[in-house]
């Protein structure tokens, strides 16, 4: 895992954390596969447990050997961008949640056939714009 010290807001490689909108992240690299930003060690750990692929980390310097150490280790050889809190806050626009962010590849969405297989009830919601916050599961009681 290369630790890369950030010295300016235009440092190469950090655009995924600050220069792209949610829509641009969804289409990053190739349509159908995009990128999302996981915030905090707990969220990153759950994403890794679910099989999501880490692409890069951004971490406050003090957390590299602290609260983010286990996440950094689990992410293998992905770059870890670091700097002081003020620079990272300016770069991202907010204080990093528990000091660490992780850019991760979005999974390929399942086909309609896969979604509907063995399903008795489907809910269709119109007008949802930010799907990253919509995690609905319908549980049917017998």
Model-derived regions, located:
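Boundary-proximal intrinsically disordered activation/regulatory segments immediately upstream
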Residues: 1-61
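Short, glycine-rich nucleotide/cofactor-binding loops
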Residues: 32-37, 122-132
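Structural motif
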Residues: 59-63, 126-127
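Short, aromatic/basic amphipathic alpha-helical patches
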Residues: 66-76
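A glycine-rich helix N-cap at a beta->alpha junction
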Residues: 79-82
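Glycine/small-residue-rich loop that forms an oxyanion/phosphate-binding "nest" at active or ligand-binding sites
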Residues: 89
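Acidic/glycine-rich phosphate/pyrophosphate-binding loops and surrounding catalytic core
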Residues: 93-119
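Conserved small/polar residues in nucleotide/adenosyl-binding loops
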Residues: 134-141
């Amino acid at each position: 895992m290369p630790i890369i010290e950030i010295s300016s807001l235009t440092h190469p490689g950090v655009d995924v954390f600050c220069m792209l909108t949610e829509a641009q992240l969804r289409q990053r690299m190739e349509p159908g596969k995009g990128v999302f930003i996981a915030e905090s060690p707990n969220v990153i750990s759950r994403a890794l447990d679910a099989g999501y692929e880490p692409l890069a980390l951004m971490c406050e310097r003090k957390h590299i050997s602290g609260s983010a150490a286990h996440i950094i280790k689990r992410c293998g050889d992905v770059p870890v961008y670091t700097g002081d809190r003020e620079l990272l806050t300016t770069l991202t626009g907010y204080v990093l949640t528990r000091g660490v962010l992780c850019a991760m590849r979005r999974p390929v969405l399942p086909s309609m056939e896969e979604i509907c297989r063995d399903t008795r009830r489907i809910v269709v919601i119109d007008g949802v714009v930010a799907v990253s916050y919509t995690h609905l599961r319908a549980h049917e009681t017998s």
